[in-house]
Amino acid sequence: MIINHNMSAMFAQRTLGNTNLSVQKNMEKLSSGLRINRAGDDASGLAVSEKMRSQIRGLNQASTNAQNGISFIQVAESYLQETTDVIQRIRELSVQSANGIYSAEDRMYIQVEVSQLVAEIDRIASHAQFNGMNMLTGRFARETGENTVTASMWFHIGANMDQRTRAYIGTMTAAALGVRDVGDESILNIDDPEKANRAIGTLDEAIKKINKQRADLGAYQNRLEYTVIGVNVAAENLQAAESRIRDVDMAKEMVDYTKNQILVQSGTAMLAQANQATQSVLSLLR
């Protein structure tokens, strides 16, 4: 029997230390709900998980971006509806003025209302804003000529670079719609039947332009609504995949934790027994 090196105690101590470390890791995983709390737990799994998390957060923000884009389009469309109502009223007055039964004085009164309605078109265009940005004054108009300033509204609808789309909104001022002269600022004149007759054609073109813009906005909105559905599904599926990598199986981890607790208790008892064994040497010295 030797006393300088108690191999049984050394083995029990080493095993107990390893088991205590396992219990510590079990407690970390059970308290956090994560299988991977640091790179040392699973280096490759952590790298894959972080990439997935980046995509998930990007997709969630892309969904928000698309919903904000829908709100932007709905606001623009509501202002265009107001403009349409005004144009329709001007057209109605033009049809009325084109009838020969009205006197010059009658048409003068009609012209006064037309003048106010034309001013209202410009007011709508100047007040149509979203987050401080004018929507109907050409800021987001598609390029129509070599010297025309081009802009658009970009919607970033993906998690990665260049995953975006753009929307155009034409200029909807009175001049752009043809009811105010660009040069001398004169408004649509319906003070005689012939002018009123020509005005009807001008107003039909204005209505056609607005309808085309509203149809485009409707198409943009439909696309963004499908985008929201698509990115939400992608984020959900990616979240499930990331969970399988990162999250801990609580039942399995609890079984492992219970096993290690038992090993700690038995290891502690065996270490005490191994240390006690060397005490018997003293009986030989009596």
From Swiss-Prot:
> Recorded GO terms, molecular function?
structural molecule activity
Entry keyword set:
Bacterial flagellum, Periplasm
Q: Which domain of life is it from?
A: Bacteria
Record-linked SUPFAM superfamilies: Phase 1 flagellin
Question: Cross-referenced InterPro entries, in alphabetical order?
Answer: Flagellin, Flagellin_C, Flagellin_C_sub2, Flagellin_N
| UniProt key word S-adenosyl-L-methionine | no
Keyword Transmembrane assigned to the entry: answer is no
| CC per GO annotation | periplasmic flagellum
Main localization (coarse): periplasm
- Record Gene3D superfamilies: f41 fragment of flagellin, N-terminal domain (1.20.1330.10), Flagellar export chaperone, C-terminal domain (6.10.10.10)
The subcellular location is: Periplasmic flagellum; Periplasm
Record-stated family: Belongs to the bacterial flagellin family.
Subunit structure as annotated in this protein's UniProt entry: The flagellum consists of an outer layer composed of repeating units of FlaA around a core that contains several antigenically related polypeptides.
**Stated role:** Component of the core of the flagella.
- Official protein name in the record: Flagellar filament 33 kDa core protein
State the species of origin.
Treponema phagedenis
